[in-house]
Amino acid sequence: YAKASGDKVQVTRRELEYMLACETTGRERFVILGLLSQHFKTALWSNEKDERLTHVTHNGYADYYKQMPYIFHNAKINLNIALRAIQTGIPLRVLDIMGCGGFVLTSYREEIAEHFVNGEECVIYENLEDMYAKAKFYLEHEEERQRIAISGFEKVRRDFTFDNALRRILG
């Protein structure tokens, strides 16, 4: 992310913004995982292990094609904490989770709210307190959580096919 200029390193404004967004998102994810793991069984699939998250079960890398669909489908709650640098659009992870029939609790993005009914097809949180309250609620209400996961799966299967995407693009 840096451009070498002689013995100096120059970082563009855009590169700096991206690095800060990654750092901010990393800290946000750390706080969320720390909070949730103090109250609920919390598992993380990632190459990176943070030793400070002592109550989080670290499961290492999950293969996108072979393991992730199973994980997404069987997790009680799949968290999507979107990278702060991504300001618009529906994160692919949200569609992946819903396409596997998983329940997704996601940070707010305008396009998610435009395309999905909050509380019907997915659950969107606004801040840390809202995320915790919704995680607690849906862990205690399994039938409601499963109903939302099924509705989200049906929506993705119906509206987010390659054919539909091509029609919108070529429209």
Residue map of PLM features:
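Nucleotide-sugar donor-binding catalytic core of glycosyltransferases
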Residues: 1-87, 105-112
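Non-transmembrane alpha-helical segments in soluble domains
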Residues: 33-37, 69, 136, 153, ...
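Short alpha-helical segment that forms part of, or immediately flanks, the ligand-binding pocket
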Residues: 69, 92-99, 113
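Glycine-centered loop/turn motifs
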Residues: 118-119
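Conserved acidic donor-binding segment of nucleotide-sugar-dependent glycosyltransferases
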Residues: 122-128, 138-142
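Catalytic phosphate/metal-binding cores of nucleic-acid and nucleotide-processing enzymes, i.e., regions
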Residues: 128-131, 152
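A charged, aromatic-enriched C-terminal amphipathic alpha-helix characteristic of glycosyltransferases
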Residues: 140-170
